[in-house]
Amino acid sequence: QYDVGDYYTTPSVTAGSEKRNLVMIYLESGEQTLADDELFEKDAFVPLKEATTAEKGWQSIEDFQQYKGGGWTMAGIVSTQCGIPLKGTGLGGGNSSSGTDARNVGDGDVDTYLGGTTCLGDILQDNGYSNVFMGGASSTFAAKKTFLTGHGYDEVLGLADWRAAGEAEEDFRPDWGLSDERLMANAKDKVDELHAGAKQTGRPFNLSVL
């Protein structure tokens, strides 16, 4: 048992003169095995390796470990967006009881999600960014939309939006949501849209894709 408050430091950010656009892509279940071209048709990470060289250090982080209980979608989102682990029970506010397991809630089950925590979306919003999240699965899964909209995200797109947009049925996985291929195609279009908007308004953007 531990208290996150014993370790938590409120972020202090000084904005630079140049506000760059940010595109963050979550490679859920991505691992080194996908680079083995003897097991697969090709090394899936070639584009990443070309974009950021090994000298940058990202391809091999010594002693890097996933924290206990951190191997599921919302735990990964919270860890990367907020810099804290997501404990299994209690969401830091709202109408959920303290014993509610974070893995079993929907958007209607909580009013707020880690309301006392400063996350990436909060910081970017305070610095004038437009924040957009795109996911292939349902936005209501594990109260994902509640978390995102409560932490600076202006637009959250998920399964219901892709169905409403007329995506072909064969492009959906019955056990999850929109295929990665179609999600990335939509993300590319969204980047173009956000770039055009940024040129008109001068407002930078953050696009997170999972």
Each PLM stretch: what is its role?
Residues Q1-L210:
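Soluble catalytic regions of membrane-associated enzymes that act on cell-envelope
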